[in-house]
Amino acid sequence: IQEVYVMDMDGNNIHCLTHHNDAAMSNRYIARPQKMTYVSQGETLNGWVLLPMDYDPSQKYPAVFDIHGGPRAAYGESFFHEMQVWASEGYFVFFTNIRGSDGRGDAFADIRGLYGDVDYKNLMDFTDAVLQHFPTIDPDRICETGGSYGGFMTNWIIGHTDRFCCAVSQRSISNWISKSFMSDIGPYFNPDQCGASSPFAFDTLWEHSPLKYAENAKTPTLFIHSDQDHRCPLPEGMQMMQALALKGIETRMCIFHGETHELSRSGKPKHRIRRLTEITNWFNKHAK
């Protein structure tokens, strides 16, 4: 539950007026985000890292890299329940606002025609920076996940690198061509974001589709989709999962019946619990 704060107009003297969460949080580990900056493609970008519970600097730890959706969205120093769960499970958790994110103006957020290019490079540079700043992270035990645009990037990443020990692709995009004719926003959003002239510009749409590069994938990947998701329809995950299965790569799909694109935020409580359990179990299987 959100607390109520007051502060001066200059942002100083912040005071919390309510304490709704004190009892619930008193016996739980709450990781505090550590902000870091890094340089990628000539720009200074922001990221954050959560340390695992009972952190011991003499030990090596697994990690989770969580990519936000949008791409016009933004992370901050806020409470993210799933990230806190993973930190309590003994993982470092790191996340960042790459090119395409909100919060730094339209020019920064506009990556139309650049999906899979500058954003991918930013994500890899951030991973390198995190490993440099936190040498207790085991580079062979980094898990990666994301939903919506973050699911697109997850699918893109597994087709372009095998540096992550496992991945979880949620409500994702794998094929801009099929999505153009199945998604509620496909006919106009997809060509606009891919820099294509129309939904029939198949060559351009295919160039930006993770499915094109799936034959390069080696990463064990869990796919999570809702069967009532009209934004990123179920077949987007099924195509990518089938491609991995045909290559003999370990893969699994969890379909949540009756849920929508909003499963992780406003789905039925039992489904939200099951979703997070499936993700965490996948991480534990491959990183512990």
PLM feature spans:
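Structural motif
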Residues: 1-6
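Low-complexity, intrinsically disordered regions enriched in charged/polar residues
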Residues: 8-11, 199
